[in-house]
Curated annotation (Swiss-Prot):
Keywords: Apoptosis, Host cytoplasm, Host membrane, Host mitochondrion, Host mitochondrion inner membrane, Host nucleus, Host-virus interaction, Inhibition of host innate immune response by virus, Inhibition of host MAVS by virus, Inhibition of host RLR pathway by virus, Membrane, Modulation of host cell apoptosis by virus, Viral immunoevasion
Subunit description: Oligomer. Interacts with human SLC25A6/ANT3 and VDAC1. Interacts with host MAVS.
Family according to the record: Belongs to the influenza viruses PB1-F2 family.
Superkingdom field: Viruses
Entry keyword annotation includes Membrane: yes
Additional comment: Is not encoded in all strains, and seems to be dispensable for replication.
InterPro entries named in the record: Flu_proapoptotic_PB1-F2
Gene it is expressed from: PB1
Main location: host cell
Descriptive protein name: Protein PB1-F2
Organism this protein belongs to: Influenza A virus (strain A/Memphis/101/1972 H3N2)
Protein task: Plays an important role in promoting lung pathology in both primary viral infection and secondary bacterial infection. Promotes alteration of mitochondrial morphology, dissipation of mitochondrial membrane potential, and cell death. Alternatively, inhibits the production of interferon in the infected cell at the level of host mitochondrial antiviral signaling MAVS. Its level of expression differs greatly depending on which cell type is infected, in a manner that is independent of the levels of expression of other viral proteins. Monocytic cells are more affected than epithelial cells.
Cell compartments where the protein resides: Host mitochondrion inner membrane; Host nucleus; Host cytoplasm, Host cytosol
C-alpha cells in the first residue's frame, strides 16, 4: 500500500481514530475526512475570513459612522477614478 505524504491541509482535516489491539495497546490511525467534515472545515474557515474582511473594510472608513447614499457614492467614485489613473501598470 502506498503511503501519501502529509500536507498542512490533510494534517488539519484528518481525524485520529484510536483502535485497541488484542494486547490492550492503543495505536493511532489517521483517517481521511469525509465530505461533511471537509465542508464544515471549509465553511468555518470562510466565515472567519469573511468576518475579517468586514472588520478591515470598516476600519478603512472610520469617518463613516452613519453613511448616506450620497457620501458612499462620492467615495466610490473617487476610488474608481484613482484606480483608473493608475491603469493596469501595477
Amino acid at each position: 500500500m502506498e503511503q501519501e505524504q502529509d500536507t498542512p491541509w490533510t494534517q488539519s482535516t484528518e481525524h485520529i481514530n484510536i483502535q485497541k489491539k488484542g494486547s490492550g495497546q492503543q495505536t493511532q490511525r489517521l483517517g481521511r475526512p469525509n465530505l461533511t467534515q471537509l465542508m464544515d472545515h471549509y465553511l468555518r474557515i470562510m466565515s472567519q475570513v469573511d468576518m475579517h474582511k468586514q472588520t478591515v473594510s470598516w476600519k478603512q472608513w472610520p469617518s463613516l459612522k452613519n453613511p448616506t447614499q450620497g457620501s458612499l457614492k462620492t467615495r466610490a467614485l473617487k476610488r474608481w477614478k484613482s484606480f483608473n489613473k493608475q491603469g493596469w501598470t501595477n
